Amino acid sequence: MIIMDVSVQRRMAAEILKCGIERVWIDPTQLDRVKMAMSKDDIRALIKEGVIKKKQKKGISSARVKKLKEQRKKGRRRGPGSRRGAAGARTPPKERWMATIRALRKTLKQLRDSGKIDRKVYRKLYRMAKGGAFRSRSHLFLYMREHELLK
């Protein structure tokens, strides 16, 4: 088989198809017809017939990403060796705050209901907790002992 030079036609097709020369596909069985095409109109006619086509762009495969995601969904790859950043970086600050404030409010409510603190003290400590005065439950108890608020 003789290899025909269709570089001019390929270049014209690339211009018409708005792609690079490498992405132009020419039907190997119709090379003689393509060789005869001299004008852009001839090339357009061949494109319409399907003799000349535009190859699809090469993409980036997401198969590996999907596989990793599936494994993480199962709980794999989450051990200490895979973790980057401090513990605080992995749990958002808002979630940490929510956990702390819920524990403090639950504790305060229990103390008020059991009569260990009165309503006034409860309200004062509740407001302080909201303002971020206590780091934890133990810090709250320390404050109450220091200020003799427990009955």
Curated annotation (Swiss-Prot):
Presence of keyword Ribosomal protein: yes
GO biological process per UniProt: translation
Ranges of compositional bias, category Basic residues: 57-81
Ribosomal protein is among the record's keywords: yes
Region (Disordered): 57-95
Protein family membership: Belongs to the eukaryotic ribosomal protein eL19 family.
Subunit structure as annotated in this protein's UniProt entry: Part of the 50S ribosomal subunit.
Coiled coil: none
Protein name: Large ribosomal subunit protein eL19
Keyword line: Ribonucleoprotein, Ribosomal protein, RNA-binding, rRNA-binding
SUPFAM superfamilies, per database record: Ribosomal protein L19 (L19e)
Gene: rpl19e
Function in brief: Binds to the 23S rRNA.
Gene3D superfamilies (UniProt xref): 1.10.1200.240, 1.10.1650.10
HAMAP family: Ribosomal_eL19
GO MF annotations in UniProt: large ribosomal subunit rRNA binding; RNA binding; structural constituent of ribosome
Record's GO cellular component terms: cytosolic large ribosomal subunit
